[in-house]
Structures are given as structure tokens and as C-alpha cells.
Amino acid sequence: MHVISKSAWRDAVAKDPALERPIGEWHKVAKHAEWKNLAEVRKVYPHADPVGPYTVFNIKGGTYRLIVKIEYRWQTIFVKHLLTHAEYDRGGWKQ
């Protein structure tokens, strides 16, 4: 899959350098994936959850939430947000 809009995670890594490895591992898996639907995503990431039009991944042991929009038809992932668990829970990202 082609991963677009990585600036959200670059900003998060600048704030927490320990994110670099786990987000890099996620990216490595995602860019080589050919997912056709959420069921296929969950074979690799069982805790990936659909939230409206987005898919949410736990990153760094659940400390962070990676929010993406996956266009399976075009094999493209748009990174929307990389938030701490607390930021995610506040829900402002949904607007």
C-alpha cells in the first residue's frame, strides 16, 4: 500500500522520539501490504478498529493511536493523526 501524509507522525516523533521505531515498524508492514478489507488488516493487526471512515491502530503498546483512512481499491493509506491515548479519547480529531 502507498502511505500518504506522514507529517502527522513526523510531528509526533519530534515530540516523542521513542515513537520512531514502532511507527517505522507499522510503516514497513503497511507499505508491503495488499489489504483488501478490514478483515485482512486484522490478520496482521487484530486490534485495528473501524471508527467512522477511519481505521485506528494502537502504536507503542497502546500509548498512541494512529488514525488512517484506507482506500483499499487504490491501495492507499492516508495518515490523518497520530495521537496519544488521552488526545484520542478527547475526540476532537473526529471533527
Which residues does each PLM region occupy?
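Basic, Lys/Arg-enriched alpha-helical interface segments
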Residues: M1-T63, E71-T76, A86-Q95
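Catalytic Cys-His active-site segments of thiol-dependent hydrolases/isopeptidases
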Residues: V79-L83
